[in-house]
Amino acid sequence: MPTPKKGARLGGSPSHQRKILSNLAAQLFEHGAIRTTDAKAKLLRPYAEKLITKAKSGTLADRRNVAKLIPNKEIISVLFDDIAPKVADRSGGYTRIIKLENRKGDNAPMSQISLVTEELASSEASRATRAAASKKAEEEAASEAE
């Protein structure tokens, strides 16, 4: 017997929640960023990240599984052809949630959820910048001591 999911239920019924998440994910993949309520953004993040992970493999079976959840073929092609190659080197964390001001009409907490497509900074580059910063700090400390 399936047990009910705990937590926020968007729209009342489970089928309505699935449709809401499907439409939000489609809009996120189409536009790159969307404004929505905090509750919807928090539920959309793992949903969208699982779809992006499936798109990274690029197999026909994964494309069909994503097509079951997102019925728009253009958005599926954007996901597999544009978004997945940009995040191929990432192992997760494809989305970012930024808190915004509350909505004017009903004071609902709003957020912007967006795709993270920037390149990851390599550990060697960050190590080099830290080394340069520490060397500069040592030079400043030495000049102040004199």
UniProtKB/Swiss-Prot annotation:
BP GO terms, sorted: translation
Positions of transmembrane segments: none
Protein name: Large ribosomal subunit protein bL17
Family affiliation: Belongs to the bacterial ribosomal protein bL17 family.
Molecular function via GO: structural constituent of ribosome
One GO cellular component, as annotated: cytosolic large ribosomal subunit
Keywords: Ribonucleoprotein, Ribosomal protein
Skewed-composition ranges (Low complexity): 124-134
This protein's record includes keyword Ribonucleoprotein: yes
